[in-house]
Amino acid sequence: MADNSTILEKLDGLVARFEEISTLITDPAVIADQKRYVKLTKEYKDLDDLMKARKEYIQLLGNIEEAKNILSNESDADMREMAKEEMDNSQERLPALEEEIKLMLVPADPQDSKNAILEIRGGAGGDEAAIFAGDLFRMYAKFCETKGWKMEVSNANEGTAGGYKEIVCSVTGDNVYGILKYESGVHRVQRVPATETQGRVHTSAASVAVLPEAEEFDVVINEGEIKWDTFRSGGAGGQNVNKVESGVRLRYIWKNPNTGVAEEILIECTETRDQPKNKERALARLRTFIYDKEHQKYIDDIASKRKTMVSTGDRSAKIRTYNYPQGRITDHRINYTIYNLAAFMDGDIQDCIDHLIVAENAERLKESEL
């Protein structure tokens, strides 16, 4: 069990900041500054959770002290029994609450609360890889549905035998990036393809990238320097070709502040039959792309401090294998293996993500030395 006074000192040190923010977020001048207001309301929510935990922690310590006092001085059997029960309950809850508080005190990934851009691409394996990319898309669509998140396809390039060579989606909801970020990496599938006549098991792969969606004030873009083109397209997936040019393509020259190198960014959006909406979504993807690149140094810095990488680092790393003949899923980052592949592919992936979160939290606690 942690030293009670150390945890209380840390919590007490945050009371003044919580009171300061409580006042600031009602200030009209702060509310008018959208960037500052959003940042402060996020900090307020985090500190509010800590203040509630602090209140419970002080209550538990008080309960234990009062119960000890009764047991030392009270002769009435009923009073002593009630005091012992109160002390046992409080002592049982205290270590769990301490762990919760420690995790709350460790700085969280500032991106976790953001929405996300989900990119799935068929890799090695030709048609079968594209089909598997389609299976992963369906898996994530089902998962998003269970979470109450909204998923919208921005762009899709269908495979010749089904599935997708590439599909890009935006996902909006509560703490989307903080949960989906664990899916970034290479997903490998072992199964007999529908096109296989000899019944042989093939290995194919698809890559998944999950990027925190940037807000307008996260990056600076000179919209006057964007070159726009329009073209005819269908809805998501490219079917039903329009007679109007609703698809949009943007080109933007961006200089990487970390390297000083200029590069051209090309983004297409065919999500809707409404050109202004497609422009808006293409801009959102441009902001996210630049934000992701500019924050790569931040991600690399975190990666260099950790011995085991769970949610950040190399997106080309093989993270999970889907073995159909055995009905097995193996996540290689934490040696997690289960044999419910059908349910997993139907969107039941939360348990795996929970195990990854536990592993990452353990790393965060080691870093903080709390």
From Swiss-Prot:
GO molecular function: translation release factor activity, codon specific
Family matches, as SUPFAM superfamilies: Release factor (SSF75620)
Cell compartment(s), UniProt: Cytoplasm
InterPro entries: PCRF, Pep_chain_release_fac_I, Pep_chain_release_fac_I_sf, Prokaryotic/Mito_RF, RF-1
Keyword annotations from UniProtKB, A to Z: Cytoplasm, Methylation, Protein biosynthesis
Protein family: Belongs to the prokaryotic/mitochondrial release factor family.
Signal peptide start and end residues: none
The species this protein was found in: Bacteroides thetaiotaomicron (strain ATCC 29148 / DSM 2079 / JCM 5827 / CCUG 10774 / NCTC 10582 / VPI-5482 / E50)
Identification of the protein by name: Peptide chain release factor 1
Gene: prfA
Function as written in the Swiss-Prot or TrEMBL entry: Peptide chain release factor 1 directs the termination of translation in response to the peptide chain termination codons UAG and UAA.
Gene Ontology cellular component annotations, sorted alphabetically: cytoplasm
Residues recorded as bearing N5-methylglutamine in the entry: Q239
Protein's UniProt keywords contain Cytoplasm: yes
Description of post-translational modifications: Methylated by PrmC. Methylation increases the termination efficiency of RF1.
HAMAP family given in the database record: Rel_fac_1
